[in-house]
Amino acid sequence: MAREECPGYEFFPELSEVYNDVFDWCIMHPKGKLDPVKGLWIEGSIGTGKSTLLRIVRRFCGMVRPMQQHRNGSAPMPYSFRITSALKVAAAYGKQGFAGLDDFIDNPCQAIDDLGCEPDTVSYYGASLNPLEFVMLGRYDVRHGDFTHVTTNLTAEEAMRRYGARVMDRCVEMFNFVTMQGPSCRE
């Protein structure tokens, strides 16, 4: 399944504990190390396969997780989530202001890829803000029954400096923190 998602993907033995923890989370293993009601915050060095792992998780969870009933009252559906780059979220604010961020906050299952690669502030008709900080705070407000996932090259400390203590304090409640360190897999 992993190679269907990414034909060149390789599992690295030094990351086997990370893989085991994440796939235990996927199947909601009662003795797993990660809390199955929290999302995944996958951090690590550049090129270690964080984004690819997230796509594999999305596919695998669609097969093994129970049907999800979301707060919007829709019919139960297979577990899945949309993956959006942090740059695209920031661009949405630049084009549409707060209205451009609503979909990223209200989507029942949302993943933000490459958190931290977006500009620190984005302006819309003179109103400047950090759109990802705004989205993360909004996702916190809808965290019960919804999932948020993140991939980032930032450490938790770097994310704290960038988004502030208020956001990171909420992230502790929202996420299981998983670290993927190693050399880049890219050629």
Please place each PLM-identified region on the residue numbering.
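Hydrophobic anchor at the beta1->P-loop junction of P-loop NTPases
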Residues: 42
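Conserved glycine(s) of the Walker
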Residues: 47-53
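N-terminal pre-Walker A segment at the start of P-loop NTPase domains
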Residues: 2-33
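Active-site signature of alpha/beta-hydrolase-fold catalytic machinery across serine-
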Residues: 56
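Walker A (P-loop) ATP-phosphate-binding motif of ABC ATPase nucleotide-binding domains
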Residues: 39
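Conserved nucleotide-sensing/catalytic segment adjacent to the nucleotide-binding pocket
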Residues: 71-143
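Walker A/P-loop NTP-binding motif
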Residues: 59-62
